[in-house]
């Protein structure tokens, strides 16, 4: 069985290790930066951006890959699984549409609201920091601030842990919007969960 793992982080290293402990499995990898641990385990490594869908699909076809495991969210967001499946290559990871629950925080919150999932936090999305300030004030600064898109686990900031008070919260909202952190000039703010 030829297995391709996309991604070069610790999560993917653990997956690669498990693949190599399986009988009759051959590991191939795609990663942006070389992870020496994954390199040692792999029959072959393609050093490439994990969002380069065309290169990943071509590599998978060339190596006659039976199954692809995608670790990071960014390749899921750009539809790597969708393209692999169009080319008859199986993947155990979600399609772009299924991964949206992880890649778009606003969409996820709206989905939960639409289906009346219990335990919803109060939230709003903003493209204007002045309007966001009112929402932050309503919660006395006790909020979580989340860029809408992917930030590699580095974008969410929570009062008490990452900022203190309304002024610092608004400053981070301004930064997210002006710098388009997460790829969009938009931020999701929700009440802080205790």
Residue ranges and their predicted role:
Residues 50-54, 129-130, 166:
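Structural motif corresponding to alpha-helix initiation and N-cap regions
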Residues 33-34, 149-151, 193-194:
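Glycine-rich beta-alpha junction loops
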Residues 80-87, 106, 158-161:
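Glycine-rich loop at the start of a catalytic domain that most often binds anionic cofactors/ligands
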Residues 67, 110, 118-121, 142-144, ...:
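Conserved ATP-binding module of the ATP-grasp superfamily
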Residues 92-155, 160:
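A conserved helix-loop-beta module that forms one wall/lid of the active-site cleft
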Residues 1, 24-25, 64-65, 87-88, ...:
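Short coil/turn connectors at secondary-structure junctions
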Residues 1-97:
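ATP-binding N-terminal substructure of ATP-dependent carboxylate-amine bond-forming enzymes
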């Amino acid at each position: 069985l030829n297995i391709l793992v996309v991604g070069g982080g610790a999560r993917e290293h653990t997956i690669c290790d498990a693949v190599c402990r399986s009988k009759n499995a051959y590991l191939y990898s795609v990663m942006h930066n070389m992870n020496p641990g994954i390199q040692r385990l792999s029959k072959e490594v393609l050093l490439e951006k994990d969002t380069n869908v065309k290169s990943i699909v071509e590599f998978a076809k060339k190596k006659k890959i039976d199954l692809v495991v995608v670790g990071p969210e960014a390749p899921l967001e750009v539809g790597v699984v969708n393209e692999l499946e169009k080319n008859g290559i199986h993947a155990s990871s979600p399609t772009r549409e299924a991964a949206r629950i992880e890649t778009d925080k606003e969409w996820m919150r709206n989905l939960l609201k639409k289906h009346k999932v219990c335990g919803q936090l109060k939230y709003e999305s903003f493209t204007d920091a002045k309007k966001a300030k009112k929402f932050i004030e309503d919660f006395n600064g006790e909020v979580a601030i989340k860029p809408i898109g992917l930030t590699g686990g580095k974008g969410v900031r929570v009062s008490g842990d990452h900022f203190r008070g309304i002024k610092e919260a608004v400053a981070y909202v301004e930064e997210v919007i002006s710098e388009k952190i997460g790829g969009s000039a938009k931020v999701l703010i929700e009440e802080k969960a205790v």
